[in-house]
Amino acid sequence: MVLSRGETKKNSVRLTAKQEKKPQSTFQTLKQSLKLSNNKKLKQDSTQHSNDTNKSVKAKKNGTSSKKTGTQRKRISTQRFSLFTYGNVQVMNSFVPIHNDIPNSSCIRRNSQVSANNVTESSGVFFNDTQSQDSQNTIKLKPTSLMAKGPIEIYQICTGFDKLKENIAPFQKSSKASSHDGHVVNYLSIGRHGDIVHPVLPKLQITRLNGAGFKYFISFYNPERYWEIEFLPLISQSQSELENSVKAFENVISKICQFSHINEGATIGNNESLSDKFKLPPTSDIEPPNTEIINNDDDNDDDDDNYDDDDLNYLLDEEYEQGCTDNSFSVISNTCSNLNASFLYPSDPTDAVSISINEAFKNAIRRTAPVLNIPIAAPSIHSKQQNKRYSSYPFIDSPPYLQDRHRRFQRRSISGLGDL
């Protein structure tokens, strides 16, 4: 019985499998076919999208590559032209000490205070000082160090030209009247491996020293710095060939920068040049500045004294109304007489002028000194007497217990006037 039951189970499983293997209905087949078609469409869309992305990436890559090729083409349009070459050149870094010492203002003040009697003596001293300063201002070109030795080349770099024609010379490209739009820069290269490269701008100054050898000086914005370029002969080279190469060099630099000549006779020493540009005029043609300052100061002093005399004449000529004749100011009159008697007028006119100015100043101080209403000798008579200069300002009478205090104050003021 147990076996029959197991067999029946196996048979039932086989029957179910056979039933599953039976053909499906038309509806189910249509449904499955639709599913399959949808899956195929999705796959096709995904493949198309991937293809589109690949195409866009390729297009971007192609665009970047085309841009790179375009930039490369622009770089190719930048060309280098050699204008001049020579094989043996020596370059020295030179220094020109230029000292223009201006006299200090303190010296000018001291010189202005010298009197007219000492002008001749002091002028000789100052003249010698200016000669010593001029001797110190001699200009010497000192080569300090060797910068490079080897070949020299002047080349030109042209950028921004769309079409560079072979029949156009490089100088025509650098000219302003050129029909091509672009940028041209000239360079000076010195040394075997281009040890020194310097741009040759239109305002660069190159000067030739006419004399023994072929020397050229390149000046910079700093007037104390120079480059000395000397052309040396090559091996088995004649003098005429060297002169021809030098002429070609001058022809090139005269077209691209400022070129000039100077003579060796105008220099000082063997390695000293360019003194014409900084040479000071001779001392014999120029009067010493210190003597001029002294003379001008003396004239100005005389004019100032006359002007002061004119301004202070009213103090000397005006009569002092309350002066020293007053009985109440007897002490002041005595001091005034002593002051006038103490002055001794020397023969020197400058001292006389100074004394007259001092007198006028003292008279002005006496007039502006405060005059108190409290009298010293006669209080009842002079109680209402006031100074004419201060008549517009009313004075307040002091009480009698302050008389001693005012007397002491007035004595101090009188003693102060006596010290003058």
Swiss-Prot record:
Keywords: Membrane, Peroxisome, Phosphoprotein. Residues 295-309 have a biased composition (Acidic residues). The modification Phosphoserine is found at residue 273. Residues 45-56 have a biased composition (Polar residues). It comes from the Eukaryota. It is found in: Peroxisome membrane. GO terms for biological process: peroxisome inheritance. Transmembrane segments: none annotated. The keyword Flavoprotein does not apply. It holds the Pfam family Inp1. It is a peripheral membrane protein. Residues 30-39 have a biased composition (Low complexity). One of its GO terms (cellular component) is extrinsic component of intraperoxisomal membrane. Coiled coil: none annotated. Residues 1-10 have a biased composition (Basic and acidic residues). Interacts with PEX25, PEX30 and VPS1. Present with 639 molecules/cell in log phase SD medium. Required for peroxisome inheritance. Belongs to the INP1 family. This is Inheritance of peroxisomes protein 1. It comes from Saccharomyces cerevisiae (strain ATCC 204508 / S288c) (Baker's yeast). The gene is INP1.
